[in-house]
Amino acid sequence: MNSKLFSPYTIKNVTLKNRIVMSPMCMYSSGNEDGRVTNFHLIHYGTRAAGQVGLVMVEATAVLAEGRISNNDLGIWDDNLIEGLHKTTTFIHDNGAKAAIQLAHAGRKAELDTNAFAPSAIPFNDKMKIPVEMNIQQIKETILAFQRAALRSKQAGFDVIELHGAHGYLINEFLSPLTNKRTDKYGGSPENRYRFLREIIDSVNEVWDGPIFVRISANDYHPDGLTVQDYVQYTKWMKEQGIDLIDCSSGAVVPAHIDVYPGYQVQYAKHIKEHTNIATGAVGLITTGSQAEQILNNNEADLIFIGRELLRNPYFPRIAANELGFELQEPHQYKRAPGKIHTNK
């Protein structure tokens, strides 16, 4: 049986063997608080590659040490961190998948002992510290840090870069009027609030020629915040700069109630795709092969990002293929166990 979920997908100069992406998820497992890859990361990502995920995306990886969400996050702020990341891409590639990395800065949501930095001195909530409002020099240094991180990503062997512009972290903070109250060229109008991301993309393009994704929070879930229609305009600007795919998540820029249900964010991937003609990724409570297949067949997204379901079962692609009646080409080491997988779901 043919399956769109298991059909190849080419984006720029990279061909994925299927449309399943391991969504970036922080593992908080850099045990020495130095940003380094550990054996856990090698097994964690390598296993999903062996499980036949098409694109394995490494978790939010900090471009500056002070830009980590926690002390145990992965980092890419120094050349001495390349070796561990290169081992990770080798594990992924050797097991048949392409490798991506999400480049990130936590902004005001950095839970470290040092200062947090943000476009404006507004805390996320009353339990978190008041961040330092970034000056122009700090903004320029952060943009340069993203560029250097992109170059290190190339040296580490990654095929795809994703810029983390969602979930209330630094890029998202500049984009949203809820968190950006600046009166200089980086605040005020949508064009000015986009300027930080624009300059990051320009700087990354100088050193990286592979596919670039951007993860967005397509809805602030606040009456004064951004909606998916605002992100249509942002996406048009990103597309003009050469961005290849928009990974459509939502929320977390400010505390808000979100109604969560299966595929609750697919609507954003569909809307962005329809109104900008750019490739999109759908993410959020996508847990079965038939659900993923339907999203693709309905032309609501181009790639399917799987998160917690891959934590529950690193061999999700095999189960999805079984569900869809698709014969999956597995590692030769596993061919002694042919036939259907029986689950209790």
UniProtKB/Swiss-Prot annotation:
HAMAP family, sorted: NamA (MF_01614)
Gene3D superfamilies per the record?
Aldolase class I
**Purpose:** Catalyzes the reduction of the double bond of an array of alpha,beta-unsaturated aldehydes and ketones. It also reduces the nitro group of nitroester and nitroaromatic compounds. It could have a role in detoxification processes.
Native species of this protein? Answer: Bacillus cereus (strain ATCC 14579 / DSM 31 / CCUG 7414 / JCM 2152 / NBRC 15305 / NCIMB 9373 / NCTC 2599 / NRRL B-3711)
Q: Write out the catalysed reaction.
A: A + NADPH + H(+) = AH2 + NADP(+)
Superkingdom as given in the UniProt entry? Bacteria
InterPro entries assigned: Aldolase_TIM, NADPH_DH_bac, OxRdtase_FMN_N, YqjM-like
**Documented EC number(s):** 1.6.99.1
| Entry protein name | NADPH dehydrogenase
A GO term (biological process) for this protein? response to toxic substance
Give GO terms: molecular function aspect only: FMN binding; NADP binding; NADPH dehydrogenase activity
* Residue sites binding FMN per the record: 23-26, 60, 102, 215, 307-308
The subunit field of the Swiss-Prot or TrEMBL record says: Homotetramer.
Q: Which residues bind substrate per the record? A: 28, 164-167
